[in-house]
From Swiss-Prot:
InterPro entries the record matches: Na/H_antiporter_dom_sf, NhaA
Alphabetical keyword list: Antiport, Cell inner membrane, Cell membrane, Ion transport, Membrane, Sodium, Sodium transport, Transmembrane, Transmembrane helix, Transport
Catalyses which reaction(s): Na(+)(in) + 2 H(+)(out) = Na(+)(out) + 2 H(+)(in)
Species assigned in the record: Gluconacetobacter diazotrophicus (strain ATCC 49037 / DSM 5601 / CCUG 37298 / CIP 103539 / LMG 7603 / PAl5)
GO molecular function: sodium:proton antiporter activity
Membrane-topology descriptor: Multi-pass membrane protein
Location in the cell: Cell inner membrane
Function: Na(+)/H(+) antiporter that extrudes sodium in exchange for external protons.
Biological process, per Gene Ontology: regulation of pH
Name assigned to this protein: Na(+)/H(+) antiporter NhaA
């Protein structure tokens, strides 16, 4: 009996420490937000997410509610972890050579351009709707990884690594889009301060400073400066991640690097706290007044088309072209048929897509239809990808 209990506890710990465990918590938190928003306690849920909590920097209004703090503040750590993941892969992982980097990067570029064009094609003639062109460009690794792990032998280890690298590149490209296209009017003194802090972080790396707390302080100062500058403050996580040293020096060689220590400390926080909070705050869409025919309106139809059609077409065609031109090679035990199935899974756009939807339609009635399009497109993409990879004949 004791051995049985111990085995179950060990199994639970393994699950909680796995990507699938994190995805389950994110899904449960998101469902909780959705259920509360459509329950008799909807008013309490709305009051919680919109609780005033205002910050102003240099005359620029910052996050003013709890859900805004989650999106503009806590999500900075999510973007930081994304950058740390890709740096780790480049230094020691599956992206440690240019040819290994090329395939997922080219696929991610195709998976960004074609969905955006698909969305713009569907929403042409609706000027306000076109602001959401970037919503279908990102892939959510938190949900794609558990699906391909559940497929087991149907997806090779090399194919899994390729999809995860592509999803990370997708997130990075999404961050670039946010920084470039979704900022406010620039305030140059604050932008100059952000440049100074960035230069200090780069200098700290160059002169061999390996104290993580120094970079954490720099990240906070950079976040404040970016908030005042008009650029999106979550860019602070990206810049700090790029500046964190990936190597140890001197007597510390062989020990954990600052990058490793930061990733070890932040990944559980992001997985178990920040992403579930984000899902809980952003998926609480009330269905009151929403009719099925609203799903064919420009915004949700454009998002669904971008995720379900644009994503797989963009990723697959870019990957096929890069292999035909011998720019990159497919992973071992991976056919173009498998690539197509994995390309379908790339249409699972959740975290970044919701994030961009909030930025695209602030204080607009279009944000709820946008979220409905994200949910529908992501679910259909997950189902289509799973069915293809599970039941299609080997190519």
């Amino acid at each position: 009996m004791a051995e049985s209990v111990a085995a179950r506890v060990a199994s639970l710990r393994r699950f909680l420490g796995s990507p699938s465990g994190g995805a389950c918590v994110l899904l449960l938190a998101s469902l909780a937000g959705f259920v509360l928003a459509n329950s008799p306690w909807a008013a309490g849920y709305t009051a919680l997410t919109t609780t005033p909590l205002t910050l102003s920097v240099l005359g620029k209004r910052g996050p003013d509610t709890i859900d805004a703090w989650v999106s503009d503040g806590f999500m900075t750590l999510f973007f930081l972890v994304v950058i740390l993941e890709i740096k780790t892969e480049i230094v020691t992982g599956h992206l440690s050579s240019p040819r290994r980097v090329a395939l997922p990067l080219i696929g991610a570029l195709g998976g960004m351009i074609v969905p955006a064009l698909t969305y713009l094609l569907v929403t042409c003639g609706h000027p306000e709707a076109t602001r959401g062109w970037a919503i279908p460009v990102a892939t959510d690794a938190a949900f794609t990884l558990p699906i391909i792990l559940a497929l087991g032998r149907h997806v090779s280890a090399g194919a899994r690594a390729w999809l995860m690298a592509l999803a990370i590149f997708d997130d990075v490209l999404g961050i670039v889009v946010i920084a470039v296209f979704y900022g406010n009017a620039l305030y140059w003194p604050a932008l100059a301060a952000a440049v100074v802090v960035t230069a200090a972080l780069i200098g700290a790396n160059r002169i061999g400073i390996r104290t993580v707390w120094g970079y954490a302080t720099g990240c906070i100062l950079l976040w404040i400066a970016l908030l005042g500058s008009g650029l999106h403050p979550t860019l602070a996580g990206v810049i700090t991640g790029l500046c964190l040293p990936a190597t140890a020096l001197g007597r510390n060689v062989g020990q954990a690097t600052p990058l490793d220590r930061a990733a070890s400390a932040l990944t559980p926080v992001v997985t178990w706290v920040i992403l579930p909070l984000f899902g809980f705050m952003n998926v609480g869409v009330s269905l009151r007044g929403i009719h099925p025919d609203m799903m064919v309106d420009a915004v949700p139809l454009g998002i669904m088309s971008g995720l379900l059609i644009g994503k797989p077409v963009g990723v697959f065609s870019a990957t096929l072209l890069s292999t035909r031109l011998r720019i990159a090679t497919l992973p071992a035990e991976t056919s173009m048929g498998k690539v197509f199935g994995l390309s379908l899974l790339c249409g699972i756009g959740f975290t970044i897509s919701l994030f961009i939807a909030n930025l695209s339609f602030p204080d607009s009635g279009l944000v709820i239809p946008a979220k409905m399009g994200i949910f529908a497109g992501s679910v259909l993409s997950a189902l289509a990808g799973w069915l293809w990879l599970r039941f299609s004949p080997e190519q």
